[in-house]
Amino acid sequence: MASQDGTTELLSQSVNSTCIPGSTYHVDRGRASSASTPPTSPPLSEVDYTPLLESTQEPRHEYTQLAHSLVKAMADYVGHLQEENLPMPSLEPAAQVHGGLKVQGGVAARDTVVKLAQKIVAMTMDPEMKLFISSLQFHFCSSLKVAIDLRVHELDECFRASSRQADALALARYREPHEADTLGFGLAFNTTANFWEVLARDTEGKRSQRFNRAMRAVNINALEVIPRIYPFNRIGGNGLLVDVGGGLGQVARAIMATNQGSRLQRCIVQDVCAADDVLEEVLESNRKLGVELQRHDFFDKQPVTGASIYFFRHIFHDWPDRACVKILKQIVQAMGRDSRLLICDQVVDDEPSIPATLYDIDMWTLFGGKERNRSEWEALFRAADERLYIKKVWTTTEAPTTILEVCLW
C-alpha cells in the first residue's frame, strides 16, 4: 500500500529487506518477489514482524533490536494514521501536527516511536553527551552569560514592542513597512514617535543607557574585525572617509588606527548628536587619529562632497525601504567619480538562518527596518539611482559581518 509520500512503501521495504523465515517475501535490492505470485508489498498493518525479530542465530544486540523495534512502532503508527485518514508526518511548514489522534492506540504508538528514537540517539552519541544536551546545561550557562552581559532584564523596549507587533502587522494590512507606520513599539508605548525620537526625548537617560550598553556588547568583536574586511589602506581619491551615522567615532577610530600611514588620511564622523556633551578624552582620541565630528542628519543633503568613502554601519537595517532610498539619494548627489559607498550590514541568505530571521523581526518591531538578501539590496540601490551597483561583497571567516562595496556606473 503506497502512501502520499511513499513512506509506507519505504517502511515495508525496510522490514522485508532480507529473507524472512516463515514468510513468502523475498527482497532483492528492494524488489519483492515470489515463485508463484507477482511482486507485491503487504499493508504495513498486515506485516508479521515476529519472524524478523526472532530470526537470528545468535542473541541480537540491544542497539540492533532497537532499530527493528522502531520500524515496527513506526509501521504501527502509520497504520493508525491511515485508519484516521491523517497525513504522513512531515517537516514541511504546512504539515499537520498529529495532536488530534482520536484513538488512544494511535497516541500510544506515536509515543513509542518518540521514546525508541530518543533511546537510539542516546546510544549513538553516548549517554553522557545525550544527557548533557537534553538537560540544556550548556544552553542555560551560555544564555545566562549573554543575558547578564546585555542586561536583558532591562530591555523593556524590545519585549514590550514584540508583544504588540502582531497588532501592528494587522494595522498595516500585512504589507512592507513605511516610515509613518505604527509599529509594535508605538503600540506598546502609546506613541506616534519612532524609536530614535523617543530615545532623544529620554530626559532621565535610562533608555539611552540601556541602548548604549547593548551597542557596546554588540561592538566588542566587530571593532576589531571591520578594519580587516575591506582594504581601507588602498583607497583612491582624496583619502577621506565619511562615517555617516557613526556616533562618537568608535568604528572610525578602529579603522584609522589600523590604517596609519596609508592612503586613508582623514575621517569625518557624522551624527545628529555628534557635538553633544562629548567627553574631552574622546575628542582627544579622535584628534590623534585624524577623526573629527560633524553634526548631520543623513536624511538631509550631504555636506561633504567627493569623499573617497561614504561608510554606513548598521544604519540601513534600522529603516524601511522608502527611508533607505531617501538616505541613498543624498549620498549619490555627493559622490564623485571615484567615490565608494561602503555598507556594513547583513546580507542574509535566500533561506536565512534562525538567528538572522529573529534579528530581522527585531529590526521590524522596533524600527520598521529589515535584514536584506542580495537581491533586496540590489533592488534598493536601483530604486535610489539606476547607476548604483554592487561591485563586491566583502566577507570574513572571523565574523558574520559583511561590507557591500557600491559604486556608480
From Swiss-Prot:
Q: Where is this region: Disordered?
A: 1-46
Residue ranges, compositional bias (Polar residues): 1-21
User: What functional role does this protein have?
Assistant: O-methyltransferase; part of the gene cluster that mediates the biosynthesis of the mycotoxin pyrichalasin H, a tyrosine-derived cytochalasan that inhibits the growth of rice seedlings, but also inhibits lymphocyte capping and actin polymerization and alters cell morphology. Pyrichalasin H is indicated as the responsible agent for the genus-specific pathogenicity of M.grisea toward crabgrass. The first step in the pathway is catalyzed by the O-methyltransferase pyiA which methylates free tyrosine to generate the precursor O-methyltyrosine.
Q: Which InterPro entries match?
A: COMT-like, O_MeTrfase_dom, SAM-dependent_MTases_sf
Pathway field of the UniProt record reads:
Mycotoxin biosynthesis
Give the similarity note: Belongs to the class I-like SAM-binding methyltransferase superfamily. Cation-independent O-methyltransferase family.
Q: Name one GO molecular function term.
A: O-methyltransferase activity
Q: What happens when the gene is disrupted?
A: Leads to the loss of pyrichalasin H production, but accumulates the tyrosine and phenylalanine analogs of pyrichalasin H, called magnachalasin H and cytochalasin H.
The UniProt entry's GO biological process terms, in alphabetical order, are: methylation; secondary metabolite biosynthetic process
Pfam (any one): Methyltransf_2
The alphabetized UniProt keywords are: Methyltransferase, S-adenosyl-L-methionine, Transferase
Instruction: Kindly identify the residues recorded as the active site.
Output: H317 (proton acceptor)
Residues that, per the record, bind S-adenosyl-L-methionine: D271
Q: What is this protein called?
A: O-methyltransferase pyiA
User: Which Enzyme Commission numbers does its entry carry?
Assistant: 2.1.1.-
